[in-house]
């Protein structure tokens, strides 16, 4: 289940994201949709990086009764990548949501020898997302 906090004026259909979340975990996930400036501020505050990014994830520790964590998406980045790659903003949001969910579940592409990327490709295929998103996973 997704607790969706849309802080933008963009309408995003999260039906597919709900299916992905349910498939990956029985725990609730918070999804926050932000603009680039809000994302930049959060990235600076939590990671010391003074620029925006497409997705951030913040896991919650403490047991199976708490939400899994929070995933933040920059709608500006989602929209730009979707246009560049020729797919919908929902498809791009799904890729970034998958990426964030896997981080919440303990995957870390910086250290895991490609396990997260492989899992992302598997989920892209499973949920019928455009194959162009598989190429996109190489850049995340």
UniProtKB/Swiss-Prot annotation:
Q: Which compartments is it annotated to reside in?
A: Cytoplasm
In Gene Ontology terms, what is one molecular function of this protein? Answer: metalloendopeptidase activity
GO BP terms, alphabetized? rRNA processing
Pfam name, any one? YbeY
Q: Where does Zn(2+) bind?
A: 99, 103, 109
The free-text cofactor remark is:
Binds 1 zinc ion.
- The main location class comes to cytoplasm
Gene3D superfamilies for the chain: Metalloproteases ('zincins'), catalytic domain
Coiled-coil annotation reads none
This chain's function reads: Single strand-specific metallo-endoribonuclease involved in late-stage 70S ribosome quality control and in maturation of the 3' terminus of the 16S rRNA.
The name under which this protein is listed is: Endoribonuclease YbeY
Q: Which gene encodes it?
A: ybeY
């Amino acid at each position: 289940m997704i607790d969706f906090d849309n802080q933008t004026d963009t309408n995003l259909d999260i039906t597919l994201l709900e299916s992905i979340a349910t498939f990956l975990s029985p725990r609730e996930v918070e999804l926050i949709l932000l603009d680039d400036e809000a994302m930049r501020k959060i990235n600076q505050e939590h990671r010391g990086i003074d620029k925006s990014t497409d997705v951030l994830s913040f896991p919650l520790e403490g047991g199976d009764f708490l939400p899994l964590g929070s995933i933040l998406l920059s709608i500006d980045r989602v929209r730009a990548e979707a246009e560049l790659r020729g797919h919908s903003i929902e498809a791009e949001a799904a890729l970034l949501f998958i990426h964030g969910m896997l981080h919440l579940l303990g995957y870390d592409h910086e250290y895991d020898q490609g396990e997260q990327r492989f899992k992302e490709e598997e989920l892209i295929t499973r949920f019928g997302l455009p194959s162009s998103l598989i190429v996109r996973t190489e850049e995340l």
